[in-house]
UniProtKB/Swiss-Prot annotation:
InterPro entries, sorted: Znf_C2H2_sf, Znf_C2H2_type
Zinc finger motifs (C2H2-type), residue ranges: 362-386, 392-416, 422-444
Name of the protein this chain belongs to: Krueppel-like factor 5
Gene name in the database record: Klf5
GO molecular function, one term: RNA polymerase II cis-regulatory region sequence-specific DNA binding
Amino acid sequence: MPTRVLTMSARLGPLPQPPAAQDEPVFAQLKPVLGAANPARDAALFSGDDLKHAHHHPPAPPPAAGPRLPSEELVQTRCEMEKYLTPQLPPVPIISEHKKYRRDSASVVDQFFTDTEGIPYSINMNVFLPDITHLRTGLYKSQRPCVTQIKTEPVTIFSHQSESTAPPPPPAPTQALPEFTSIFSSHQTTAPPQEVNNIFIKQELPIPDLHLSVPSQQGHLYQLLNTPDLDMPSSTNQTAVMDTLNVSMAGLNPHPSAVPQTSMKQFQGMPPCTYTMPSQFLPQQATYFPPSPPSSEPGSPDRQAEMLQNLTPPPSYAATIASKLAIHNPNLPATLPVNSPTLPPVRYNRRSNPDLEKRRIHFCDYNGCTKVYTKSSHLKAHLRTHTGEKPYKCTWEGCDWRFARSDELTRHYRKHTGAKPFQCMVCQRSFSRSDHLALHMKRHQN
């Protein structure tokens, strides 16, 4: 303790100035800059004892003459030795080479020492609050949790799948991402979609396009609804229909591996039954179809024999009106919308048929007439209507009728003879004109 007191008192006493050649390199560079303008500010900035000794002591008086005591020599020696010790300067934050803002040279230090009062240094806030954009992205983690779009469900719901499937493979080790993407990475492991922390990640299969496979199943469904085996009491009919529909709808599933696991658990709430699927429900060509719509093609004499198999005697007009006003039974199988709606074939008449338009090459050259024909004979007969020529004369006695076309004369001649060559093969009714027979055949079809 006495030694420490002596040291403190010795420091307060006069000390000789050290020579300039023995100064440290750092203080040698700062000496032209510091000066003695504001001693209080220099004391706040430099906490080293050597700086205080170098700038704050008054000029030392000449030492007293006389012999020196050993304690005084020890104090003097210790003071001289303290000059060579490392001064305790404030710690300087370490900045990387590419982040140095100013050079560590003596020519730039003078900007930190100005005559203005206040903060002695222009404090760089980047030293105390570093910019995170210059840091490595791998060292910075976002505080916001990553939002994952994973639908989680308890494991107990899918217990039947874990029993029938093989145990899941062990999870793969975590794969490290590059540094520029590690800021977005979260602590997750690359594992198959199985049980993770008692949470099951549900794998939802895409919904199959039912309209693609419906045409192949429509015949079987229609056959199922029209078989007489379903006309049984409701107690057994319900379970049989449900099992059959289960098998029928299982054919629509594009993933056949999932059928044994899911088809047995669809109707768990229903009582078990021992109904076996009949052979007529197996995939085969259906034999029950709704009746096809009647053909609306006009009849002709050469097709009468072909239409005999499908025609019935025409009903009376009263029966026709009554059938249009009658209410159809909704339970009839014909009312089931089984077959996909197909557009009826487009029918053209003689004026709108595109095939006939291509073959119509004979134009009428009469002024203002736009008639076109496929045959030259038809055009010649048409030109007689413009010229008024009627070369075909009726040969019946006392008849002076003349016609421009031969078919018109033939039709007229039947009026004299009473011939009716066009006969209906269904009702045995005869007509003198073919168009009259075609109109009559439409009544049989309707």
